């Protein structure tokens, strides 16, 4: 550390001298960090799945409804993985429940994590195709078929950003 002294003299102060000063009392003066379970609790891990459903070169995007966390944000439809389910089973179930249609799961796009104030959401997004029915609103505020290049213009839930980036550059 360099300290300017009267008369324009420069004095080097060693880190050891600084540590001994009252400005920095040293690590012994602070409570010991014990990691998760000590000072902080480990965030709840919430595993969810999302479907990037493709039809006629467009991707189905869903806007979260009022009264839900992240209301007004866009997402790929899907939901939580229940105990004993594979991600694919959870996605099939969630799409049937939320959109009243059936999908064929093609391939995994990506898995991403985002730490929200309510927990750590781990989203696995799959590329999917409609096989029966047309998506209908049951839980979302709005659903839209969007050109992949236009997807970044929507206000997406943070955990969906990686999948949006990967899908927006694709041609279906």
Region locations from a protein language model:
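Conserved N-terminal beta-strand and adjoining loop/helix that marks the start
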Residues: 41-59, 80
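Conserved Nudix-box catalytic region and its N-terminal flanking loop in Nudix hydrolases
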Residues: 58-97
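NUDIX/MutT-family hydrolases
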Residues: 127, 136-167
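Active-site-adjacent beta-strand/loop module that shapes the phosphate/pyrophosphate-binding cleft
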Residues: 102, 112-134, 144, 148
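Short, Lys/Arg-enriched N-terminal segments with co-localized hydrophobic residues
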Residues: 28-39
């Amino acid at each position: 550390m360099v300290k300017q002294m009267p008369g324009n003299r420069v004095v080097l102060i060693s880190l050891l001298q600084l540590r001994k000063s009252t400005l920095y009392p040293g690590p012994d003066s602070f409570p010991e960090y014990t990691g998760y379970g000590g000072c902080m609790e480990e965030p709840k891990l919430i595993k969810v799945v999302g479907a990037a459903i493709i039809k006629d070169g467009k991707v189905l995007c869903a806007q979260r409804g009022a009264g839900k966390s992240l209301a007004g944000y866009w997402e790929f439809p899907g939901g939580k993985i229940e105990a004993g389910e594979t991600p694919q089973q959870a996605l099939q179930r969630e799409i049937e429940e939320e959109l009243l249609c059936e999908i064929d799961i093609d391939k995994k796009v990506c898995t991403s994590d985002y730490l929200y104030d309510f927990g750590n959401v781990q989203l696995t997004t799959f590329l999917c195709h409609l096989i029966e029915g047309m998506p209908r609103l049951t839980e979302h505020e709005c659903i839209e078929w969007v050109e992949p290049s236009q997807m970044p213009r929507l206000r997406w839930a943070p955990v969906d950003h990686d999948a949006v980036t990967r899908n927006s550059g694709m041609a279906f």
